[in-house]
């Protein structure tokens, strides 16, 4: 009934067999290219913390010691006391990370690992588990030098301003107003405590500049000589955050992985002690010149010393104190010479 059916069936099978043979001989499609490596990215939250830190340093280091009345003293105390220790520390680490990202050698050393997704993830997780892992990355010494220079300079500015203001506490005592009792003493102590628990804010323009600097679009112009390890915990964590940013693991999506590194117990203790000393000082201070001393010593000089110590630096001796010591030593030496020259000579006894 269908005499050509077997023939057609044979042809179909033959065609299928030929197609299968040709398919087996064809080259397989090329593998999909790997995804492009992630770009350098630092979370906007970390950038904001760095900006808030820089804003406080800028305000504190420009408080004028030329006080003319009690209101100026009260205003200056409010400005100086307005930082939250934990936030200031996180801001210092974040700014240190931006500083480290200014070093081309360190960035290149980290970016050498981003081509392989598995290797990139491994390096990032190593840093998350142990921040000191970042110290072993090529270029870390020059990056650490920038971190130390940037944070050390910030701390030195605040410290030096504090010393000038502390000296003003003695100088203004020639003015009658400085010996008047501070108005609302209890309220100003309470306000200092409230300001110490209120997060600070940075400048929008500065945050934009830091964001651009973190990706190499607008360098900050920092300078600093390479420094070999060991480094302070704060510097190590700045390097670690910078390395995670260069690996693509410090952006907003990975912030939960980066935030645990934003700590330094020693610096936290130092800043908290500065605050405690401020509260105790304000609690007993009565005249305005004593508030000026509290501001200079415990708000600014102590805080600046904490920032320098966090960067692994030692606060330099106070030149005013050193000069006073030198004058005292010179006076003592002069008095000793005068005493020795006036001492009567022993009489000779007759034989």
Residue ranges and their predicted role:
Residues 14-21:
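Bacterial N-terminal signal peptides
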Residues 254-318:
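Secreted, short cysteine-rich peptides and small extracellular cysteine-rich domains stabilized by multiple disulfide
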Residues 8, 36-39, 93, 227, ...:
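A near-ubiquitous, low-amplitude feature marking generic local secondary-structure context
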Residues 305-351:
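Short, low-complexity, Pro/Ser/Thr/Gly-rich segments in the mature regions of secreted, periplasmic
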Residues 2-13:
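Bacterial N-terminal signal peptides that target proteins for export
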Residues 2-3, 25-249, 329-347:
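Acidic/polar low-complexity scaffolding segments in large eukaryotic proteins
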